Regions:
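Catalytic cores of extracellular degradative/oxidative enzymes
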Residues: 1-195, 200-270
Length: 273
């Protein structure tokens, strides 16, 4: 019943029922496949091309935002990110590998429907209606309700969208994504009180608008907001806490290191000065 989805967690603690598209998405295998032409990696990407069909049966937000509390008439529900963006990566990959424009059209349908929402990507309580047959997203709740979600730009979503907008030039979506990038930080601070830095969005907005003040703000955030004032220490972790003895710095985590590094790479490309 979970074919096409992946298991969230299951590493540092027990897993849960939140099997999600972001874990099994084609974006994870795509570069490896194009570099090596490994056929098994290609199979894995093919297997998830229609993973959104599972949304008819499995709602990724059934526990966090139950449908009874946030009703909608759409046949399924999802978040713009990381859910929809994971599916978009699947469809983009299938389209570029096979030339099947049905997957491109599903992406465009989603882009147009999100752009038409009252507040674009910010619209709603954190979950939107979705039709897996057409790719259209919808919202039937309070038109003034807005929410931010930092997961939109992680798990590959930011990279997928940057590539995709070079493949599909849709003016209304370009405006929607730019608005999202330009306004995210302030809305995250005032609406959801989420301090998680999404530096790449600020950098994107700076690059697209040529705003040097925004560019400086992005670099300042990369160097200072991400900076940890705790002393750099190394501790030895022994068996049985780990399979083999290892040295670790307890203030450095994989998520932060990866996100910071991706931001640094991107910013050197688009706002090098």
């Amino acid at each position: 019943p979970f074919a096409g989805l992946g298991s969230r967690h299951n590493v540092s603690h027990w897993g849960c029922g939140a099997k999600e598209a972001r874990i099994s998405q084609a974006a994870w295998n795509r570069f490896y496949y194009y570099l090596t032409t490994d056929e098994r990696s290609g199979n894995l990407m093919t297997e998830v091309r229609d993973a959104e069909q599972k949304l008819y049966d499995i709602d990724p937000m059934r526990l966090a935002l139950p449908r009874e509390k946030y009703p909608c008439t759409a046949p399924a529900r999802l978040r713009v990110g990381p859910d929809w963006l994971a599916y978009v990566g699947n469809w983009m990959t299938e389209w570029e590998r096979t030339g099947n424009t049905a997957y491109r059209d599903k992406i465009i349908a989603g882009m147009k429907s999100i752009a038409a929402l009252p507040h674009g990507i910010f619209t709603g309580p954190g979950v939107l209606g979705f039709d897996p047959a057409t790719g259209v997203l919808s919202y039937e709740g309070d038109p003034d309700l807005q929410r931010t979600e930092h997961l939109i730009t992680i798990m590959g979503g930011f990279q997928v969208m940057n590539e995709l907008m070079e493949m599909i030039d849709l003016p209304e979506w370009n405006r929607t994504w730019l608005t999202f990038a330009r306004e995210y930080k302030e809305k995250a601070r005032t609406i959801t009180h989420n301090p998680f830095p999404v530096t790449r969005l600020t950098a994107y907005a700076a690059a697209k608008t040529g705003n040097r003040e925004l560019a400086a703000e992005a670099w300042d955030e990369l160097w200072h907001v991400w900076h940890n004032d705790k002393p750099f220490t190394v501790r030895r972790v022994e068996v049985p806490e780990v399979p083999a003895p290892v040295d670790e710095n307890p203030v450095v985590c994989t998520n932060d290191a990866a996100t910071w590094s991706l931001a640094a790479i991107y910013m050197q490309e688009v706002i090098p000065e």
